[in-house]
Structures are given as structure tokens and as C-alpha cells.
């Protein structure tokens, strides 16, 4: 006679597929179920072991695939211990055995239903666990994005302002270079004008010397003319005395040369020559004087215009120097403002980059946590699927063995009645 025992065992599963064995006849029949605590990481798997002992061949199988079976002289093992060749299918307390078998079958079906309920409970707990352990609600980074956009706009505006300042500095530098070029040109022109003025001064000095020389020559000519007049008068007086002393001689002698006429002619000739020389000297003197006066007037006008130009150039130079100093001071102020702005916005940009780095680190951590939870969820779903397959396999096996058992039980009385009829 076969004996049956049923005991409950519990094993803990952390993850991954695990093997289960099913044996009928001197073996064990294990139907697992899964349950998990709320919020926990581990999953407990409880299995019900159905142990039978008896004679006959065993039905062996493994979880996850095929299972082999062999029968010898009836169904022996899982549900019976005397179901072989011999004196019939059942002997002794047949009703007790069948009742025990039916009770065991009902208990197993209850266990199957309990496993299904545990499976549904497990699915509920998995969903709850996923909701608890899953990623929380997405954080609202829109204020940070708005602040970043505002800072970017400020940086862009500051960059544009800096570009404008740099452009103004470049324009001021170009204007200063232009003014410097103009100043150098005007300075060269001033030096040229001063050189011309110095040359005109030398010419004026030369003309003054020439005028002085001419005046000296005129004075010398006047003195020479006075000396000639004096000599002429002396000669005339001497000749007059000679003529008076020779009157008597001339009376007696033959008529000679008319000396008075000769002297008058000589006087006229000398006076004409002197007048001509005087007029020529006066004309030359007047022409030279007028020429010198004209040159002096022209040079004076040029000197006055050059002085006015030099004054204007000095005034322009002073204005340019003042403007250059103001531009240099403005450039220094703008450069200091640019440095302060770059430092301030650089610090703000560094803070924003640090904030972005921390947010990216948090996002990476959240992604890693989500991937880990997703892998755990997939593992649990795989365990659930395998358990469902195992339950379905057990159910099919139970239904097949039950049909074979009842077929054997229904066919055995016919076999036992035939020898009786033969007798």
C-alpha cells in the first residue's frame, strides 16, 4: 500500500530562474508560488511538496522544459503504490485510498488556486513596488531654463555692448591715428612754413643789406657829385683867373680858342652826365626800393598768414590732444567696465555650469536608478512568467494524470470480472 505525505516548504529567491523538479513514484511533486513583501527587494517562493512512495516507475521532469515519463503495468508512483501487475488495481481499503486521493487532489487544487491568488497578489505588489521604487515625478526645470535663458540673453547683450565698446575704441583709435597723421602733416607743413619764413627773413636781411649798400652808394655818389661840383667850381675859378690874366696877351695875339665856350660846354656836359647819373641812380634806387617794398609786403603777408596758420594749428593740436586724452580715459573706463562685466558674468556662468553639472549628475543617477529598477522589474516579470508556465505545466500534468488514473480505474473492474466469468 502506498503512503502519501504533503508538506509545505519555503525558499527565498533574489532573482534569476531556478529549477524545480517533478517526480511521481517514490519522488516529490513541488508546486511553487511567489509572494513578496511591500517595498522589499527580495521575493519569497513557497512550494508545496507532494511526496508519495510506492512501487512502479517514476515520472521525472525539470522546470523549464520537457519531462519524461514511463509507466510499467499501470500508474505507479505519484498516486498509488500498488498499481502494477498482480492481483488487481486496488486492494484493501479501496474507498479509503480513493478518499485520501480525492482529498489530496482537492488540497492540490486548493494550493493551485492559492498559487493563482498569490500570483495575482504578486502582480499587484510588483505594480505597487514599481510605483514606489520607480522614478518619481519629473522635476520642473523650467525656472532654471528660464534663468539660463535670461542669463544667456544678458551675456549676449553684454557681448553686444562689449562689441560696441570695442568698436568705439577702434573708431577712437582710428580717429586718434587720423588726428595724429593730420598733426604730423600739419607739423611738417608748419616746419616747411617756418623754413620758408626763415628763408624770407634771410632774403629780407639780404635786401636790407642791399638797400643799405645802395644808400651808401647813393651817399657816395652824392659826395662824389658834390666833390665834382666843387672841383668844377675851383677849376672854373682858376680858369677865370687865367682868362683875366691873359686878356692883354690875347689882344695882341691872334684870336685863339674860346675857353669860356669850351668850359661852358664841359660844364654842360658834366652837368648833363651828373644829372643823367643822378636820374639813373634815383630810378634804380626807386625801382629797387619798390621791388623790395613789394617783396617785403608779400613776405609780410605770407608771414602773417603763416603765423595765423601756426596759431590755428596750435589750437587744433591742443583740441586734438584734449580729445585724445578724453578718448584714452574713456578707453580705460570701458576696458575696466569690460573686465568687471566679464568677471561678473564669468562667475555667474560658472555657477550656472556647476548647477547644470549637478542637475546632469542627478539626471544620470535617476537614469541609473530607473535602469536598475527596470532590470529588477524585468527579472520579477521573468520569474512571474516562469512560475505561470510552471503552474500551467503542473495543471496540465495533473489533468493528464487524473484522466489516466480515472481511465485505469474504470478499466480495471472489467479486467477483474473477465476471469470470474470464465470460471
From Swiss-Prot:
PROSITE patterns reported in the protein's UniProt record: IF_ROD_1, IF_ROD_2
Alphabetical list of SMART domains matching this protein: Filament
Protein name per UniProt: Keratin, type I cytoskeletal 19
Miscellaneous section: There are two types of cytoskeletal and microfibrillar keratin: I (acidic; 40-55 kDa) and II (neutral to basic; 56-70 kDa).
Single GO molecular function: structural molecule activity
Region of interest (Necessary for interaction with PNN), ranges: 258-415
Residue segments, region Rod-like helical tail: 402-414
Amino acid at each position: 500500500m502506498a503512503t502519501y505525505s504533503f508538506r509545505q516548504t519555503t525558499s527565498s529567491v533574489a532573482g534569476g530562474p531556478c529549477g524545480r523538479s517533478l517526480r511521481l513514484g517514490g519522488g516529490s511533486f513541488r508546486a511553487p508560488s511567489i509572494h513578496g513583501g511591500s517595498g522589499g527587494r527580495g521575493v519569497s517562493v513557497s512550494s508545496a511538496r507532494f511526496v508519495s512512495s510506492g512501487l512502479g516507475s517514476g515520472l521525472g521532469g525539470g522546470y523549464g522544459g520537457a519531462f519524461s515519463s514511463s509507466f510499467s503495468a499501470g500508474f505507479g508512483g505519484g498516486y498509488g503504490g500498488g498499481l502494477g501487475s498482480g492481483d488487481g488495481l486496488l486492494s484493501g481499503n479501496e474507498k479509503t485510498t480513493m478518499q485520501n486521493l480525492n482529498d489530496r487532489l482537492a488540497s492540490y487544487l486548493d494550493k493551485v488556486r492559492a498559487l493563482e491568488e498569490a500570483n495575482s497578489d504578486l502582480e499587484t505588489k510588483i505594480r505597487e513596488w514599481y510605483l514606489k521604487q520607480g522614478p518619481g515625478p519629473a522635476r520642473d526645470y523650467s525656472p532654471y531654463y528660464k534663468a539660463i535663458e535670461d542669463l544667456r540673453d544678458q551675456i549676449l547683450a553684454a557681448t553686444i555692448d562689449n562689441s560696441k565698446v570695442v568698436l568705439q575704441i577702434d573708431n577712437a583709435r582710428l580717429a586718434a591715428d587720423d588726428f595724429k597723421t593730420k598733426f604730423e602733416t600739419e607739423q611738417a607743413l608748419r616746419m616747411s612754413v617756418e623754413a620758408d619764413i626763415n628763408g624770407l627773413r634771410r632774403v629780407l636781411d639780404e635786401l636790407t643789406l642791399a638797400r643799405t649798400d645802395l644808400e651808401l652808394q647813393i651817399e657816395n655818389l652824392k659826395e662824389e657829385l658834390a666833390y665834382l661840383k666843387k672841383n668844377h667850381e675851383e677849376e672854373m675859378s682858376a680858369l677865370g683867373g687865367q682868362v683875366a690874366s691873359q686878356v692883354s696877351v690875347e689882344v695882341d695875339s691872334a684870336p685863339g680858342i674860346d675857353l669860356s665856350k669850351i668850359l661852358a660846354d664841359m660844364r654842360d656836359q658834366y652837368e648833363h652826365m651828373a644829372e643823367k647819373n643822378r636820374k639813373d641812380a634815383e630810378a634804380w634806387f626807386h625801382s629797387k626800393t619798390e621791388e623790395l617794398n613789394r617783396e617785403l609786403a608779400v613776405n609780410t603777408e605770407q608771414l602773417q598768414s603763416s603765423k595765423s596758420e601756426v596759431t590755428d594749428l596750435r589750437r587744433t593740436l591742443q583740441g586734438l590732444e584734449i580729445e585724445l586724452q578724453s578718448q584714452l580715459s574713456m578707453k580705460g573706463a570701458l576696458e575696466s567696465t569690460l573686465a568687471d562685466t566679464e568677471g561678473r558674468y564669468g562667475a555667474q556662468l560658472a555657477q550656472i555650469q556647476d548647477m547644470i553639472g549637478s542637475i546632469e549628475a542627478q539626471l544620470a543617477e535617476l537614469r541609473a536608478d530607473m535602469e536598475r529598477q527596470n532590470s529588477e522589474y524585468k527579472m520579477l516579470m521573468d520569474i512571474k512568467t516562469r512560475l505561470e508556465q510552471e503552474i500551467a505545466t503542473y495543471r496540465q500534468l495533473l489533468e493528464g494524470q487524473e484522466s489516466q488514473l480515472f481511465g485505469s480505474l474504470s478499466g480495471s473492474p472489467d479486467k477483474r470480472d473477465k476471469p470470474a466469468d470464465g470460471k
